[in-house]
Regions:
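Catalytic pocket-lining loop regions of alpha/beta-barrel enzymes
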Residues: 3-6, 131, 141-253
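Active-site gating/metal-coordination segments in enzymes
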Residues: 5, 75-76, 84-176
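Active-site environment of divalent metal-dependent phosphoester hydrolases
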Residues: 29-34, 84-87, 115-117, 168-174, ...
Length: 300
């Protein structure tokens, strides 16, 4: 408990020194308890889509984890869920809506999966969902699947951000990589995508997509951390000037993967600071860019 209190003070000091009112984290996970239990079991077993031991640093009930984020001063965060089989997505969307109802700081999140009903259940919730999440690796589907074409069109028209895990880390899968995402954007150029993990390990290619598409953003989830670097996700130093420009241009957002991380939350923040891209960049990434993308918070 004392270690957590020390971390709370350090996290608040991190953003307080920047003159920020708190943090906005675009990439956190809250799931129905049976689903979260299965996710944790995969991490504990270092499952095939993980590729290495992954000792979870935070493991508790939703109520405790929400209070942890509040104690850190995370003013807004997501409850990202993702479907890995048909018939699952809308159930997750209902659960996420109920979670956001009882947690004022939580953005209303949703997901979808290539299935005949996708466009209908997305359309039914499009007025309320604030962020979607798609996991190409875990879902093992192509974002170009024709069953999703109408859904992508609806989401593009609405302008709702979609956090998409499409990079080939930590373990590549059949449909990961920048190619399918580039083709998706050629079909739906108005899509507002947030590339999870900066697209690791295909950093250069995904940075290029953000540079060439007005509505494509990147999140920092696990990037630059010691753990990620040990997995082969070292961010190339020569890309730092481009990363700086994208961050100052509103395109890079703080993400953490909390609570499913194998190190303290503070380490993600310290990893950003040691890039030495400047306080203006840190302010933009940790708060201002997400605030601009998401709009004002709901009344609490």
């Amino acid at each position: 408990m004392e270690a957590l209190r020390t971390e709370e003070r350090a996290v608040r000091d991190w953003w307080g020194r920047l003159g920020l009112p708190g943090l906005v984290d675009i990439h956190t996970h809250f799931l129905p308890p049976p689903v979260m239990a299965k996710v944790r079991a995969q991490f504990d077993a270092a499952g095939p889509l993980i590729g290495r031991p992954w000792p979870l640093h935070y493991r508790d009930t939703d109520d405790v984890l929400v209070e942890t984020l509040r104690s850190f001063g995370v003013a807004r965060f997501t409850a990202l869920a993702y479907a890995h089989k048909p018939g699952m997505a809308d159930w997750l969307n209902q659960w996420a809506a109920e979670f956001a109802d009882r947690v004022p700081e939580a953005l209303v999140c949703g997901t979808f999966f290539p299935e005949e009903s996708a466009a209908a259940y997305v359309a039914a919730r499009l007025d309320t969902i604030e962020v979607f999440k798609i996991h190409v690796q875990v879902g093992n589907f192509s974002p170009l699947d024709l069953l999703l074409d109408e859904t992508w069109g609806l989401v593009a028209e609405a302008g709702t951000p979609v956090v998409i895990h499409a990079g080939s880390g930590p373990v590549p899968a059949a449909y990961t990589g920048p190619g399918p995402v580039g083709e998706l954007l050629s079909r739906h150029p108005r899509l507002r995508l947030v590339i999870a993990h900066l697209g690791a390990p295909e950093y250069a290619e995904f940075l290029a997509l953000a540079e060439s598409h007005e509505r494509v953003h990147l999140d920092t989830t696990m990037a630059f951390t010691d753990f990620f670097s040990e997995m082969g996700g070292v961010f190339p130093a020569e890309l730092s000037p481009r990363l700086r420009d994208l961050g100052l241009g509103g395109k890079v957002l703080l993400g953490s993967d909390f609570p499913n991380i194998p190190y303290p939350y503070l380490h993600q923040l310290e990893s950003l600071r040691r890039l030495e891209l400047g306080d203006d960049w840190l302010r933009a990434v940790a708060h201002d860019n997400a605030r601009a993308l998401l709009g004002p918070p709901k009344t609490m």
